[in-house]
Amino acid sequence: MSPSYYILKIYVMNNDFPLKEKYSKMCVQKQRIIEESISSNIDCGIDLFCPNDVKIKNSSLSNKVPMGIKCSMTFGGMFSGYYLYPRSSMGAKTPLRLSNSVGIIDAGYRGELGALLDNHDKVKRKAQGMDENAIFNYYTIEKGDRIVQICSPNLTYPIYPILVNNENELGESIRGSDGFGSTGR
């Protein structure tokens, strides 16, 4: 019998308890949906939470936003690569875009996940509810915001997320933790 879902192991770095709580709740919810076959319309992606407030200057490119987690994905016991996509709300509600459109995470990558973001906003904006003279030339991603998502290489199968307590539970890799162009030009 072939597997019916991908397994995504998530390790939260730096003992960030609030971030770990968010992932724990999400994992339990997604696991329940898959185990109980609650819905045939299971989401393709697993949202990632921004671990800190991040300000991204207007008209700036390739701003690295660390996600505070490390992951590995398997399908049928074999390690699998996976994708990092923007959530639809990023395009609809923010001036942000992924610099490389889609992040491809190799099966052997075990480093911290991150997103390279461009801020296409050219206008200085007044912050809502702030003094009329307060003008900002950046966009703020707030701690806990969901801006990107992990998707499996085959969107037909859902992702079963598991929160792990030890980085070693992600599995061994020759590749290691170098990312963003580290394997060559």
Write out the residue ranges for each language-model feature.
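DUTPase catalytic domain/fold
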Residues: 1-185
